[in-house]
Amino acid sequence: MKKFKFLIAIFSLLITLGCSVKENRDGCPCRLFLDMTSLDMVDQSPFKLDIMSDDGFEYKAVLNVENFKDTCVVDVPRTGLDVMVWSGGGSFMDENGLTIPFGRDCPPVYIYSARLEADGESICDVVKLRKNYCLLSVSIEEPDAVISLTVRGGVSGFDKLGKPSGGEFSVFSDVAHESYPSITFCLPRQNEAPIYLDVTESDGRIRTFPLHDYIAEFGYDWSKPDLNDLNMILNFTPVGVTITIKSWEEELIIDVVI
């Protein structure tokens, strides 16, 4: 009987401890679930995944056909996280983000960027890649009047959090060797830095046009999640040039007196 009472006492103590003592899970990781179902493995892969935390944690992976899954699962520390997924950066990608070499177009880069708070046992987010480049197509009504075009600006890529980064950007196009009717430049998402179009005419004169002013007057929004493409028409006249900026739905005509 004494042995039986002793066992009951021990059992009661275990129940009491199990109910009153809570496990401290502060040191346990948070499980991050990234829903990748919206990604296009055919046209957009491979994908570069970067996860960075406030306390120095880093996780990097390349997702391609061989290792791609609809849901990516990563154990992360319980703190603030910056999560990045890149597509289309190619050889321009490095540990600091994406850098566009001088003289090159921006690559067709798509970026998912999220700030997440991993403060529980798990956290989920849907990865949706956003278009971070603008195709600027320039048509010249009198191609014989122009030798070359150069687009230049002050954004030369993206930092590791996917924000436009400062640097010298310049792309040159020899009009005589391009397929008419248009020449296309690929521009990265912009910040407040100006953008210029240098036009070298057949007589050797170089004329510079403030593209940033024209694009702003047109109402173009560089902060949109997915950037629109633009079309520009240059029509040289005896007294100047008429610049027409067009998108799918809008048109702006600017007369510049030279």
For the regions a protein language model found, what residue spans apply to each?
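Sec-dependent bacterial lipoprotein signal peptides
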Residues: 1-23
